[in-house]
Amino acid sequence: MKSTVEKLSPTRVRINVEVPFAELEPDIDKAFKQLAQQIRLPGFRPGKAPRKLLEARVGRGAVLEQVVNDALPTRYSQAVTSESLQPIGQPEIEVTKLEDNEELVFTAEVDVRPEIDLPDLSTLTITVDPVSVTDEDIEAEIEALQKRFGTLTGVERPAENGDFVSIDLSATVDGKDVPEAKTEGLSHELGSGQLIEGLDEAIIGLSEDESKTFTTTLVAGEHAGREAEVTVTVKSIKVRELPELDDEFAQLASEFDTMDELRADLREKVTRVKTVQQAEAIRDKAIEVLLEQTEVPLPEAVVQAQVDDTLHNAIHGLDHDEDRFADSLKEQGSSREEFDADNRANAEKAIKTQLLMDAIADKLEIQVGQNDLSERLVLMSRQYGLEPQQLLQMLQQNNQLPAMFADVRRGLTVAAVVYAATVTDTDGTEIDTTEFFGPSGDQAAAQQGAGEDDSEAAVEVSEDTADDASEDDTADDTK
């Protein structure tokens, strides 16, 4: 087999492949064996009919068509390997010549990872805000804790902002009931803005067992984006009574004996949270600086595929009704033009970032170990409420392990970038990034649950599983 490559653009190539007919003999044998199992000829057991009779029955053209269908994927993969290409996305294959007993010639156009001129990572400078914990931050935590230990007491008066109410809801669209909008005994805090627009205004001033109907736009379900007449009935009204902020409260709400001890502990926790947030800002800034300093050619087909996928997901819940989608965007203060522009910009940035991180990972020879995969699986299993081993099986069944592998590798790459760069805060103080971005590959910056006990046993990821994920990482989530 011979193959050559034409560079159509920095991100797209055409592979020309010539396969001598002699090399197709195994594929021809396979095609005849399949036909022999499918076709029953008088006087022959299944699978035993001779080639000539099978060919006479179905025609030589049908046999060659089967041969081509079987041969193309394998020969394409061989050409990609021999030419050391890194495809992203699926190829467009065209058979340009098929001469019986002579040769098979086909072309394959495919997007590939571009060559990227990478900057010297040691020259990168990253600047972020310093970690600042104020007394107001601590008092906000105290207030939240105080509310958590408050008690609700019923009152006999019209509802006011800040009250807790139990309500019944129903809705109609064009005079017809909306079953999914009907609910009873729903608890709601007035002023929280957590439910539909206009609800709080309708409830305020109502007394127990009083109702009011108002007009609003539904944001979910079959009628999302449509105007509806919503009726709310107040069933009960309660106020929250807060405990005194004294040492007795500290003992009730924590393991500490005094409010001073509680405040000191909260200051440590807030500092830790803000330190993690700073690490996340460092990570994001590192990517931003790299994108500013590096030219990354974009594969248009890959960008368009991601744009289309995002749009599909956005309107899927609206039965792909473009008018309802436009109405929904309008209610959010946006428009289809703004959505499309943001969608494309986000897709371009995401794909540029992925290609850039992959190029740096290749240059730095970033390796993903079993521990790296195990840590990510444990983190993801917490987020999804699954056992790590159960999540691993789901990822394998859905062929999502390579995408996870690629994401972990990019995370390790960002850590390496940050560790090599100079990182300071806006006050000019250099920041020690070792904890989150050190050579150990600690992924703590990506873990929201900083400070939690990570002593639970990590899922065992076999070497074969890790190797399979690595080998499949050729057409990952840039598709």
UniProtKB/Swiss-Prot annotation:
UniProt biased composition (Low complexity): 441-450
Keywords: Cell cycle, Cell division, Chaperone, Cytoplasm, Isomerase, Rotamase
Entries under Pfam families matching the protein: FKBP_C (PF00254), Trigger_C (PF05698), Trigger_N (PF05697)
Superkingdom of the source species: Bacteria
GO MF term (any one): protein folding chaperone
E.C. code: 5.2.1.8
PPIase FKBP-type domain ranges (all copies): 162-243
UniProt domain comment: Consists of 3 domains; the N-terminus binds the ribosome, the middle domain has PPIase activity, while the C-terminus has intrinsic chaperone activity on its own.
Function text: Involved in protein export. Acts as a chaperone by maintaining the newly synthesized protein in an open conformation. Functions as a peptidyl-prolyl cis-trans isomerase.
Protein name (record): Trigger factor
Organism: Mycolicibacterium gilvum (strain PYR-GCK)
Phylogenetic classification of the source organism: Bacteria, Bacillati, Actinomycetota, Actinomycetes, Mycobacteriales
